[in-house]
């Protein structure tokens, strides 16, 4: 009998929402989460009780408890605090530098600094658990997608998040590449496809070529601050301004109102994708401070009005499409197929502009929210040996190089080079008798080193003293299939070499990862115990309610000694529900309540029998008997 293959799941860890998928036979199946939804909001919230909420329950707290609810953490993963100062102003929680200068979150209810990797891990763990429930077996490996523009630090940080969640990330995959796989591009001959990915928080365009089992990403472009959230904000701002004109009240100062407005704006946007107008109705949105009377918000929003509001946003996406085509030296007519990815592509104006620009209908065969996760599942299937005949070629989105004499960036790997790739160049010393050289690794498109992103610095020492230009230093850049960069510098005269994995400069150390994993495991055990205690208290509370109800309805039919015993145990149970910290305490009192309930049920049953035999009122006794039965 053939050994069962270990399942590898595919995960789209999105800025706004995340999705998990797995190959079942020849099909990528999207898995529902614990709430029964295929979309899981990428939101984590910490309560005062130290409970950690993930997904939809956390999203509902985003405005009610903004300091303790982290959303769009993907914007900060693998980045230095200095790089994200502007980003930090856009969120309601506090972004601070950690001891290494990396971006972290100061969450009061967490009682510590929380790193973006930890937030990502909470979301990934929820998706992992959903997959395990669906498959009925443990899941240990995953393919996780990232935006095409993610640099090496961000990719490594995403892998760290997976490790914290208990997942071995066997491949990091560019989101547009995943979409191409989901659409079966590899099955077509000589096809050019443009992936237009308009998600909740980011916008990406990729141009790919495929045929004969090969997928190659040629060009990527994008804007990390363009997404469906911008459209929601436009609707929300309009509602706030309209309400202010009518009442003089600014709803921005009311957190509860803002949460409701945010949800209503998102819902209105979705409805206007298939309706010409929608009514936004928010009763009791606030209180009039002058009359102390409740105020209601009721507005009609038409599709035409929405399109006016968001025209510039859609225009910006088309500008980025033009930039990608220019980079690829292509015209719109050179594109064979346009693929729409991301929930925002459901908006009719988006589809209309794409159709006008390319002169053809965009391809909409798959759910745009799920297509990336499905592609990740297909790649996972390839790695697990379940799917054959796909060769995947990703590209590096930005040029990579080193700083050379005079502060110039010398490029080793140009932008849009297919990966995996290895490139080497020979350099020499800039000064006489130089015994060491600094290797400064850079990423970007600017000619001067200072204008590009610094990825890492390391030193090659022990070079024999010689006149400048004599030593030969070979520098090799090696990008693996996950887009992680390895840099090696070797003195060809002595054979001495030094190397660096670029992500280490900003990622978590192995010790930190282990600590976070340990913390997460300890927290999971606490969560399980907490959940069991709450469930036990709920059961006890239900039994107490039934017993009180039976006592009240039976009235004087309950003997005094039984009634006294029941009242005592009810009092004890209520105190236990309020104060118990151990499940055993609750179980002991639950047993007492069940015993008293049983005794009372037996007594009432006997009394009812006597009444029936004596020709007394049967109806009243019957009701007491029926109500008493569930207590047994």
Curated annotation (Swiss-Prot):
Which key words are in the record?
ATP-binding, Chaperone, Nucleotide-binding, Phosphoprotein, Stress response
Q: Which Gene3D superfamilies match?
A: 1.20.1270.10, 3.30.420.40, Actin, Chain A, domain 4 (3.90.640.10), Substrate Binding Domain Of DNAk, Chain A, domain 1 (2.60.34.10)
Single Gene Ontology MF annotation: ATP binding
Asked whether the UniProt record includes Chaperone among its keywords, one would answer yes
Q: Which SUPFAM superfamilies match?
A: Actin-like ATPase domain, Heat shock protein 70kD (HSP70), C-terminal subdomain, Heat shock protein 70kD (HSP70), peptide-binding domain
Record-linked Pfam families = HSP70
* Comp. bias intervals (Basic and acidic residues): 615-632
What does its record list under induction?
A: By stress conditions e.g. heat shock.
Where do the segments described as Disordered lie? Answer: 603-632
Cross-referenced InterPro entries, in alphabetical order?
A: ATPase_NBD, Chaperone_DnaK, Heat_shock_70_CS, HSP70_C_sf, HSP70_peptide-bd_sf, Hsp_70_fam
Any one GO BP annotation for this protein: chaperone cofactor-dependent protein refolding
**List of residues that carry Phosphothreonine:** 202
State the PANTHER family in the record.
HEAT SHOCK PROTEIN 70KDA
| HAMAP family tied to this protein | DnaK (MF_00332)
The name on file for this protein is Chaperone protein DnaK
Species source reads Aquifex aeolicus (strain VF5)
Species classification = Bacteria, Pseudomonadati, Aquificota, Aquificia, Aquificales
């Amino acid at each position: 009998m053939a050994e069962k293959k270990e399942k590898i799941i595919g995960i789209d860890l999105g800025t706004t929402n995340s999705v998990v998928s797995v190959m079942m036979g020849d099909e990528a199946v999207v898995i529902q989460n614990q709430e029964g939804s295929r979309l899981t909001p990428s939101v984590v919230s910490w309560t005062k009780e130290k409970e950690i909420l993930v997904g939809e329950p956390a999203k509902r707290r985003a405005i009610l408890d903004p300091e303790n609810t982290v959303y769009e953490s993907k914007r900060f993963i693998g980045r230095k605090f200095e790089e994200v100062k502007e980003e930090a102003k856009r969120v309601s929680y506090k972004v601070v530098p950690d001891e290494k200068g990396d971006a972290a979150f100061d969450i009061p209810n967490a009682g510590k600094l929380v790193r973006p990797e930890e937030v990502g891990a909470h979301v990934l763990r929820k998706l992992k658990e959903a997959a395990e429930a669906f498959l009925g077996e443990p899941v240990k490996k995953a393919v996780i997608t990232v935006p095409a523009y993610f640099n090496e630090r961000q990719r490594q940080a995403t892998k760290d998040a997976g490790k914290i969640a208990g997942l071995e990330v066997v491949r990091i995959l560019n989101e547009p590449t995943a979409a191409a796989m989901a659409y079966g591009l590899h099955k077509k001959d000589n096809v050019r496809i443009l992936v237009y990915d308009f998600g909740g928080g980011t916008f990406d365009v990729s141009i790919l070529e495929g045929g004969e089992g090969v997928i190659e990403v040629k060009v990527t472009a994008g804007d990390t601050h363009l997404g469906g959230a911008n459209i929601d904000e436009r609707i929300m701002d309009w509602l706030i301004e309209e309400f202010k004109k009518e009442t003089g009240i600014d709803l921005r100062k009311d957190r509860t109102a803002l949460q409701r407005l945010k949800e209503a704006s998102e819902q209105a946007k979705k409805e206007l994708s298939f309706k010409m107008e929608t009514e936004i109705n928010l009763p009791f949105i606030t209180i009039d401070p002058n009359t102390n009377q409740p105020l209601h918000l009721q507005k009609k929003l038409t599709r035409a009005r929405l399109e006016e509001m968001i025209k510039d946003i859609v225009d910006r996406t088309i500008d980025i499409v033009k930039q990608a085509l220019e980079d690829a030296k292509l015209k719109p007519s050179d594109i064979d197929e346009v693929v729409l990815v991301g929930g925002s592509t459901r908006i009719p104006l988006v589809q209309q502009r794409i159709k006008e620009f390319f002169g053809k209908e965009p391809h909409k065969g798959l759910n745009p929210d799920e297509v990336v996760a499905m592609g990740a599942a297909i790649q996972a299937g390839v790695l697990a040996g379940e799917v054959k005949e796909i060769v995947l070629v990703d590209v590096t989105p930005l040029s990579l190089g080193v700083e050379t004499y005079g502060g110039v960036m010398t490029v080793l790997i140009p932008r849009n080079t297919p990966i995996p790739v290895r490139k080497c160049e020979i350099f020499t010393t800039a000064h006489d008798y130089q015994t060491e050289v600094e290797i400064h690794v850079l990423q970007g498109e600017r000619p001067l080193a200072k204008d590009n992103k610094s990825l890492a610095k390391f030193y090659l020492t022990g070079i024999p003293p010689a006149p400048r230009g004599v030593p030969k230093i070979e520098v090799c850049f090696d990008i693996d299939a996950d887009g992680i960069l390895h840099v090696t510098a070797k003195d060809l005269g002595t054979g001495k070499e030094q190397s660096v994995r670029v992500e280490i400069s900003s990622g978590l150390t192995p010790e930190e990862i282990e600590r976070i994993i340990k913390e997460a495991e300890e927290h999971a055990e606490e969560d399980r115990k907490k959940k069991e205690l709450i469930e036990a208290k709920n059961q006890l509370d239900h039994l107490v309610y039934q017993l009180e109800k039976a006592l009240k309805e039976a009235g004087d039919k309950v003997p005094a000694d039984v009634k006294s015993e029941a009242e005592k145990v009810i009092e004890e149970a209520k105190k236990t529900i309020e104060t118990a910290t151990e499940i055993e305490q609750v179980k002991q009192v639950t047993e007492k309540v069940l015993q008293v309930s049983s005794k009372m049920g037996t007594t009432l049953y006997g009394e009812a029998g006597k009444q029936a035999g004596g020709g007394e009122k049967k109806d009243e006794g019957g009701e007491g008997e029926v109500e008493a039965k569930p207590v047994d």
